């Protein structure tokens, strides 16, 4: 098995070791010989096609090179008894379109299939694969990769901007190309102060409305935006602007369109044999057979492909619950227990551990993030310590609780105070990312601004309050595009964000400015990210003031030299002469206030320093007396 971290060779032949490791489920670079690759055999240049179809009777390659005719010379030959097929076609070349005609050995029924390992495909609604051998790119991100390999993300800032390329911006109603995005996106992300972008899936998918989460071409770059070189150039540009790139990745299930992986050889192949495990009724997709060696090779090699070939810095693994649970989205009687009688998918668990183990061993500095909504334990615990091995987990509980809380009339918030404090009870059980993702601003859930309570002023104030509270809460951060300039309509994947409102309305411009300042504040204050997962980094001052709906807490740096005091007022009431216990004697200065006039607030800021007095309060020996603005987060810092 070849072990490499550079782009694939222009010529690569299949060896005995490749075949052995592939069928053993241990090949992590299967894309180097599976699919369509440039080859020179007996002095003749051409393309070697290789695929896996264990229940095929025959496979013929048709395409531009043979006028899409089934010809004897283009039939693949079986090279193993376990379903590997291959053929060399001399006159096939880069850019030719092609498909496989796969005939099932039991029924003699044939189907036209796209190549599962194709690097590029036709733009929907067309479905042919495209021979793509010219993929070499001269990268200029060596410094970034060196830095990545040495970075401990747990004690560094991580503030992620999630986006959907097709609807971030368009040009005259058409998709922007990767090269066009390279001209605008990196600069915007850098100016706004985000540390990473997270792209929703970039592999090929037939339905725009699936957002990429129902893929057909796992190795095919999304052709809506251009080609492989264009995407590499975009990632390179982001890295050169000191921005990491995370990719949403979907290893649990696949689209059931007939040209794709479904019943690839006329029978269950990439999916489970058992229909109750194979068919995902909720999403109308098929679940991968994660216990089958060749399927594991397909998926783990796919993760390696995106990381090695496109220098992706992290994978956000989609729908992990669907991989972990046999009864996910199924009623009683619709699923079969495992060999121990439980609902755990033992094959899925083993796959996730193997995936994370491989990436940890081979891809220094690359992270994996689990989108998982259950209480499954030890998701972000290393595999060697009994966990699944992810680096981070989205905190879906925090997201649900706090969005519910922030939508309540402040009159009733005191009765639901636990919604805004409960997350700290379990925060240290995982390495959490606080995520407000695309799923929260679509399908009738309302835009983020419209989740806020009240009239327009209170909605804007509530958004600033909520985002400032989020920045102060331990854990890394993620926000979905459009929230930063207050898009009032829900996200629509078929049109660009409503950027025009920034120029048309001062309130949108002020909020965009607020997000930039908040992001800069986060990045510059080590207390906000250095101890996200260390008990030392967070301490409540008062978590129990439900009557006034006020939270107060301390964030600290590792050396304890930097301390920030957060006071979050979730009511539209100004509190005068508020007594607050503080950990140290001295002078305190306001360093951030979401009620600032420049953000669109009422301007109730602390213009002068406040000195503590030796009077006990909230369990501390020192106390300060402050004014707390309405619907706002106030952040104080000890300066002397």
From Swiss-Prot:
SMART domains: Aamy
Origin: domain of life: Bacteria
Family matches, as InterPro entries: A-amylase/branching_C, Branching_enzy, GlgB, GlgB_N_E_set_prok, Glyco_hydro_13_cat_dom, Glyco_hydro_13_N, Glyco_hydro_b, Glycoside_hydrolase_SF
Pfam families cross-referenced by the UniProt entry: Alpha-amylase (PF00128), Alpha-amylase_C (PF02806), CBM_48 (PF02922)
UniProt keyword list: Carbohydrate metabolism, Glycogen biosynthesis, Glycogen metabolism, Glycosyltransferase, Transferase
Active site residues according to the UniProt entry: 318 (nucleophile), 371 (proton donor)
Its EC number(s): 2.4.1.18
Keyword Transferase listed: yes
Keyword Endoplasmic reticulum in annotation: no
Record-level GO BP terms: glycogen biosynthetic process
A single GO cellular-component term on record: cytosol
Catalytic reaction(s) noted: Transfers a segment of a (1->4)-alpha-D-glucan chain to a primary hydroxy group in a similar glucan chain
Example GO molecular function: cation binding
Pathway: Glycan biosynthesis; glycogen biosynthesis
Family: Belongs to the glycosyl hydrolase 13 family. GlgB subfamily.
Listed PANTHER family: 1,4-ALPHA-GLUCAN-BRANCHING ENZYME
Task of the protein: Catalyzes the formation of the alpha-1,6-glucosidic linkages in glycogen by scission of a 1,4-alpha-linked oligosaccharide from growing alpha-1,4-glucan chains and the subsequent attachment of the oligosaccharide to the alpha-1,6 position.
The protein's assembly and partners: Monomer.
Name of protein: 1,4-alpha-glucan branching enzyme GlgB
Taxonomic lineage of the native organism: Bacteria, Pseudomonadati, Pseudomonadota, Gammaproteobacteria, Thiotrichales
UniProt gene name: glgB
């Amino acid at each position: 098995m070849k072990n490499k971290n550079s782009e694939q060779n222009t010529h690569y032949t299949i060896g005995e070791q490749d075949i052995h490791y592939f069928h053993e489920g241990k090949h992590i670079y299967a894309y180097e010989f599976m699919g369509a690759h440039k080859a020179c055999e007996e002095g003749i240049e051409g393309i070697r096609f290789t695929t896996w179809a264990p229940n095929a009777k025959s496979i013929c390659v048709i395409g531009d090179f043979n006028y899409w005719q089934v010809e004897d010379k283009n039939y693949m030959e079986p090279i193993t008894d376990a379903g590997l097929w291959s053929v060399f076609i001399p006159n096939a070349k880069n850019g030719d379109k092609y498909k496989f005609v796969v005939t099932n050995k039991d029924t003699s029924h044939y189907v036209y299939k796209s190549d599962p390992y194709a690097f590029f495909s036709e733009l929907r609604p067309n479905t042919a694969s495209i021979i793509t051998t010219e993929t070499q790119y001269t990268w200029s991100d060596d410094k970034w990769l060196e830095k990545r390999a040495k970075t401990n993300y747990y004690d560094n800032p991580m503030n992620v901007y999630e986006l959907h390329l097709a609807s971030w911006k368009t040009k005259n109603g058409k998709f922007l190309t990767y090269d066009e995005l390279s001209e605008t996106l990196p600069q915007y992300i850098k100016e706004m102060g985000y540390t990473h972008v997270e792209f929703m899936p970039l592999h090929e998918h037939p339905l725009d409305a699936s957002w990429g989460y129902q893929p057909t071409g796992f190795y095919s770059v999304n052709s809506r935006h251009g080609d492989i070189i264009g995407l590499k150039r975009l990632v390179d540009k982001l890295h050169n602007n000191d921005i990491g790139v995370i990719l949403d990745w979907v290893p649990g299930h696949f689209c059931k369109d007939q040209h794709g992986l479904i019943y690839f050889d006329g029978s269950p192949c990439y999916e489970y044999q058992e229909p109750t495990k194979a068919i995902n009724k909720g999403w109308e997709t098929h679940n991968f057979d994660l216990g089958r060696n060749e399927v594991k090779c397909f998926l783990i090699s796919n993760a390696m492909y995106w990381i090695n070939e496109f220098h992706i810095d992290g994978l956000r693994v989609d729908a992990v619950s669907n991989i972990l649970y046999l009864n996910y989205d199924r009623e009683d009687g619709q699923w079969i227990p495992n060999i121990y009688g439980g609902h755990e998918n033992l094959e899925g668990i083993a796959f996730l551990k193997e995936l994370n183990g491989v990436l940890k061993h081979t891809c220094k500095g690359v992270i994996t993030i689990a989108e998982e909504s259950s209480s499954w334990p030890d998701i972000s615990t290393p595999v060697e310590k009994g966990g699944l091995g992810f680096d981070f987990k989205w905190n879906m509980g925090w997201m649900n609780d706090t969005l519910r809380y922030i939508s309540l009339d402040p009159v009733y918030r005191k009765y639901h105070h636990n919604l805004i404090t409960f997350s700290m009870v379990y925060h240290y059980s995982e390495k959490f990312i606080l995520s407000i993702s695309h799923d929260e601003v679509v399908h009738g859930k309302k835009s983020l601004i419209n989740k806020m309570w009240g009239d327009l002023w209170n909605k804007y104030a509530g958004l600033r309050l909520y985002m400032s509270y989020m920045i102060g809460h331990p854990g890394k951060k993620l926000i979905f595009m459009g929230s930063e300039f207050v898009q009032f309509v829900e996200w629509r994947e078929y049109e660009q964000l409503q950027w025009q409102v920034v120029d048309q309305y001062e309130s949108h411009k002020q909020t965009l400015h607020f997000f930039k300042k908040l992001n800069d504040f986060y990045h510059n204050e080590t207390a906000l990210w250095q101890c996200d997962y260390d008990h030392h980094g967070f301490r409540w001052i008062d978590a129990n003031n439900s009557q006034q709906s006020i939270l107060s807490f301390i964030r600290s740096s590792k050396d304890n030299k930097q301390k920030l005091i957060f006071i979050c007022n979730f009511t539209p009431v100004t509190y005068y002469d508020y007594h607050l216990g503080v950990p140290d004697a001295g002078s305190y200065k306001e360093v951030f206030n979401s009620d600032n006039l420049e953000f669109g607030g009422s301007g109730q800021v602390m213009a002068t320093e406040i000195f503590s007095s030796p009077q006990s309060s909230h369990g501390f020996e020192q106390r300060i007396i402050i004014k707390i603005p309405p619907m706002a987060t106030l952040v104080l810092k000890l300066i002397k």
